[in-house]
A protein has these predicted regions:
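N-terminal "domain-start" segment that seeds a small globular fold
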Residues: 28-45
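Oxidative protein folding and maturation machinery
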Residues: 156-200
Length: 200
């Protein structure tokens, strides 16, 4: 009888520990859920079915900042909650498998690694991008700007249409900073300064 009571006690403890482990991961989240190892066509299909943009982490195996994002940023619950609720998330090594094809397709938008692209699954166009290691809150803010229509593509289109308001110049330069495009930013600032009347 004593052995049965001890076994039941041990089983009860084991069950309690198991429940606590499951609850810990349920309550605290597991960070960003990436569709890893999926074909690009499957990622596009999933995003279209869910009515979401695609968040694509473009990385390489030798990139230190890429590893920093993978270890310190994407696993954070607040980053995972934001990304998982707003995007279909995928990641590709740009030097292997499907990543090679995707790098060729988007190389004009990948100035270095890591680059995080927001892609419209309907036409596979770039909606927004963030380049370089980015802290969790800054990444969420930059991506929220993209969801709010404050994207590099929108600012570029307005600029190319001839708009030169100070507000646009500031927003465009901020988006260029996030996209790590200092050359274009310098040109826009220089053109804006040169366009100012001398008597102002």
């Amino acid at each position: 009888m004593k052995k049965i009571i001890i076994k039941l006690y041990c089983m009860k403890k084991l069950l309690l520990v198991s429940i606590l482990i499951v609850l810990r991961f349920t309550v605290f989240g597991q960070g960003t859920e990436f569709l890893e190892g999926k074909k690009w066509s499957d990622v596009l299909k999933t995003a279209q079915e869910q009515g979401k943009y695609i968040f694509m982490d473009c990385y390489t195996s030798w990139c230190g900042p890429c590893k920093g994002l993978a270890q310190n940023v994407f696993p954070q619950p607040k980053v995972g909650a934001f990304l998982n609720s707003n995007f279909v998330c995928c990641k590709y090594d740009m030097e292997k498998g499907e990543g090679i094809m995707l790098y060729k397709k988007y190389k004009d938008n990948i100035p270095g690694f890591p680059t995080m692209l927001v892609i419209n699954p309907a036409d596979e166009s770039i909606v927004h991008k963030v380049v370089g290691y980015t802290e969790p809150d800054a990444l969420i803010a930059a991506l929220q700007d993209g969801l709010d229509g404050k994207t590099l593509a929108v600012f570029q289109k307005r600029y190319e249409a001839g708009e030169r308001s100070l507000e646009l110049i500031k927003d465009y330069c901020k988006a260029l900073d996030v996209a790590y495009d200092q050359g274009t930013k310098e040109k826009i600032v220089r053109d804006y300064i040169e366009s100012m009347p001398l008597d102002s």
